[in-house]
């Protein structure tokens, strides 16, 4: 919570969150999610979900073999992607690059490209070119 000023210009973040506290005073995913929503961020996608066996269950003599208990995850949070009109042209350009190369999120790319078309930053129907060539770009 102490980084609120630094987050004012942040477009996206990747966080490792825990589903339950592993360390003293560690916030859980629910607490992190609630806080980030209050400052304008929404979860976009999970990059990974780590599972753990519930003790004392051990599979194949390997205590690290994943069971079904959710332990922690890597998650991408974005400034509200439904309010792209609030972003500057430069922020849109940065976000579309992140969406494609870092988040592997073509649906977000298309949404941003459409916003960029409406602002005449790129040519009309460029989002269709992206859709047609998505496999070449990936």
Model-derived features with residue positions:
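Conserved acidic-Pro-Pro-aromatic motif
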Residues: 1-107, 116
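Short, charge-rich amphipathic alpha-helical segments embedded
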Residues: 113-138
């Amino acid at each position: 919570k102490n980084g609120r000023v630094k987050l004012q210009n942040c477009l996206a973040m990747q966080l490792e969150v825990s589903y339950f506290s592993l360390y003293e005073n560690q916030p859980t995913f629910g607490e992190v999610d609630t806080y980030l929503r209050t400052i304008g961020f929404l979860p976009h996608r999970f990059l990974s979900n780590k599972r753990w066996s519930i003790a004392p269950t051990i599979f194949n003599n390997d205590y690290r073999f994943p069971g079904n208990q959710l332990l922690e995850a890597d998650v991408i949070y974005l400034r509200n992607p439904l309010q792209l009109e609030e972003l500057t042209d430069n922020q849109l350009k940065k976000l579309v690059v992140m969406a494609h190369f870092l988040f592997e999120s073509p649906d977000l790319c298309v949404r941003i490209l459409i916003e960029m078309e409406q602002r005449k930053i790129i040519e009309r129907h460029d989002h269709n070119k992206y859709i047609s060539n998505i496999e070449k770009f990936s």
